[in-house]
Amino acid sequence: MKGKTGNSQSGFTLVELMISVTLGLIITSSMVQVYQSNNKLQTYNYALSNIQQDGRYIISALRQSLMMVGMYNEFSANLDRSVDVEIEGRFIKDHPVVLEADFALEPTLGSKEGTGSNPDSLVINMMDVDSCTGSNFDFADGSEFHTVNEYFLDETTLRCRGHDGRFLRGLKPNGASGQSVALLENVHNFQVLYGISQPTAGVETGAVTSWISADRLVAFVNADGSLPVVGIKLAMLIKNDDDIVIENTRSLKMLGHDKFTPSDDGLYRVFETVIVFRNVWHEVTAGG
């Protein structure tokens, strides 16, 4: 009589099963870590791209606006001639940067140095068809006139307020403007240094001989009342507004101030530029 032969089946032992589960958890954990790392890197790169775009935009916009500081062409066919254009031209060329008390109707209007590390403000004179807000202050469309633009930081928004220079000089009955436009948000500091040109060995070259803050400008006003500012340095501290947390260990530095580390975990970058006032440089070197 033949005996029965059974088919025996073997499975995972408990030890093998535990090893498999452990390896699976390790692989899954590694994949999650890689995913999180890639996700953080992608978020960081996106935030960095946005802040770089904001920085390039505002630098380009300010350079385009401020390059013409001190410009006045009394021979322009579009210049409004309801005032003495020779006197107006001399005023703008001698005062490219506005200081406090330059305008009797608004004596507090002027470029200011912020206390401590607080933001600065910049006020300039030029000839244009409108102010930085787009207003032409009831001049005919396309007419050029004395424009005063004031750049300042309102909390974390860089703004510009336009003024009618002829009104400020008492030559018009109206023209005051309290309106301002936002140039860029998420700006946490705005610093300005002014390039002063003084003669070297008795020769005026138009080169910057010193960079100073706004509170020292008065000391460099010439005997004839002119201010030899031929350029400016601008610095802006911009923060990205994306929801990103970064441990800040990188020190930053603004113009004329000590290094600092941001107090929160946002992404910050400092953007700087130098702008030469070509028209003022010509006035200084040519002697008017």
Feature roles, as predicted:
Residues K2-M71, A286:
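Aliphatic-rich helix starts adjacent to a transmembrane/signal segment
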Residues K40, Y44-L48, G55-P228, A235, ...:
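N-terminal pilin/flagellin-like segments and related low-complexity appendage regions
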Residues E272-G288:
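Charge-rich, low-complexity intrinsically disordered segments
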Residues K233-M236, E272-V274:
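Active-site scaffold segments
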